[in-house]
Curated annotation (Swiss-Prot):
Signal peptide: none annotated. Keywords: Antibiotic, Antimicrobial, Fungicide, Secreted. GO terms for cellular component: extracellular region. It is found in: Secreted. Active against Gram-positive bacteria B.megaterium and M.luteus, Gram-negative bacteria E.coli SBS363 and D22, K.pneumoniae, S.typhimurium and P.aeruginosa, yeast C.albicans and filamentous fungi F.culmorum, N.crassa, N.hematococca and T.viridae. Inactive against Gram-positive bacteria B.subtilis, S.pyogenes, B.thuringiensis and S.aureus, Gram-negative bacteria E.cloacae and E.carotovora and filamentous fungus B.bassiana. Induction: By bacterial infection. One of its GO terms (biological process) is defense response to bacterium. This is Spinigerin. It comes from Pseudacanthotermes spiniger.
């Protein structure tokens, strides 16, 4: 199964990606 820490890291990376896309608009 996926480790909680890894899942949290992936979530953070996704959020950062979305933030960057939003700031670009």
């Amino acid at each position: 199964h996926v480790d909680k820490k890894v899942a949290d890291k992936v979530l953070l990376l996704k959020q950062l990606r979305i933030m960057r896309l939003l700031t670009r608009l």
